[in-house]
A protein has these predicted regions:
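Membrane-embedded alpha-helical segments that form the functional core of polytopic membrane enzymes
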Residues: 195
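Transmembrane helical hairpin unit
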Residues: 207-214, 230-232
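Central hydrophobic cores of alpha-helical transmembrane segments
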Residues: 212-223, 245
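N-terminal organelle-targeting presequences
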Residues: 28-192, 200-203, 225-304
Length: 304
């Protein structure tokens, strides 16, 4: 395997656990550029050096993702800074999780407080709250930062399947989905994939950031649904599990606002590299080899 191929393969084996990058002291750099008017020669291993060069101008500058005057973080492929677009994306993700948490509480309230509480208002808001929460989860799955894209797409597919099942129940029964599932345990099969997608989010957050509430959600959510589906958990046990579920998801959503934005991003350079075309990656790696040999050596060593 050539050195260039080894480096490209190394990028494909990045673990999906996001490690929070350490901030490096702010430095002044030139205005970020998308590309330089400089031709970069890309040669395969063992290629005849006397042969005409294959060139590419596609690669961005090495410092293209560092914002002047802002802290920057050392990534696998490049140094990078948090941009305004990153901030909006991360905060939108957090707002979506808040919507999920509030919807969970609204849907569970009739069980926890009784359906007649507040003149039956809690039962009337179940349906809009349920689908608002489902929409929030779908948006969160679009905004979440995950290195392994197939896993992200699988979670989105689960969400879509669960949303379709939920819509089918709503259309066929004209009942609020949470109420129907509460009285018909077999309906868990229809809505279950949506909650499996949420469990995936909890797993990712728990693994990446060591959040105990997310680790607990990873077990509480499936246990609640499977206990209801199988009938093995009695009514009092179900109520206790749902109460715990609500408490955990509220803590989860609230604590997201205490995280640094960079922590939610992970290593931004991995996403940047993944979005490049093959010629851009080749040119980028060649430019890194020429201008940042130490980083190139680290990339090459990951395949060994």
């Amino acid at each position: 395997m050539s050195a260039m191929s080894s480096v490209r393969a190394a990028g494909a084996t990045v673990a999906w656990r996001a490690r929070a990058p350490r901030a490096v002291a702010s430095r002044r750099v030139a205005t970020p550029r998308v590309s330089r008017p400089r031709r970069v020669t890309v040669r395969a291993s063992g290629e005849n050096r006397d042969a005409p060069d294959e060139t590419s101008d596609a690669a961005p500058a090495i410092d293209a993702f560092v914002v002047p005057g802002e802290p920057f973080y050392p990534g696998m492929y490049a140094d990078w800074s948090v941009t305004e677009e990153d901030v909006v994306e991360v905060w939108s993700y957090r707002v979506c999780l808040t919507a999920v948490a509030l919807a969970t509480l609204a849907c569970a309230s009739p069980l926890l407080l009784g359906g007649d509480a507040f003149g039956g208002a809690l039962e009337r808001i179940q349906q809009p709250a349920y689908f608002a929460g489902a929409a929030g989860l779908g948006a969160a799955l679009g905004l979440i930062h995950m290195y392994v894209d197939p896993i992200k797409k699988f979670m989105q597919a689960l969400w879509l399947a669960g949303l379709a099942g939920s819509a089918g129940i709503a259309i066929a029964t004209h009942e609020a989905v949470p109420a129907y599932v509460a009285h018909h345990p077999s309906a868990v099969w229809a809505v279950g994939p949506l909650f499996a997608a949420f469990t995936g989010v909890a797993f990712k957050e728990g693994m990446c950031y060591g959040k105990p509430e997310c680790a607990a959600l990873f077990f509480v959510v499936p246990l609640s649904l499977l206990g209801h589906l199988s009938g093995l958990v009695h009514e009092g046990g179900e109520k206790a599990l749902v109460t715990l579920w609500c408490a955990l998801v509220l803590v989860f959503a609230s604590r997201k606002y205490t995280q640094a934005v960079k922590d939610d991003i992970g290593d931004k350079s991995v996403f940047i590299f993944a979005d490049m075309s093959e010629p851009e990656r080749d040119a980028w790696l060649e430019r890194t080899r020429e201008e940042d040999p130490r980083r190139y050596a680290r990339l090459a060593s990951q395949e060994r």
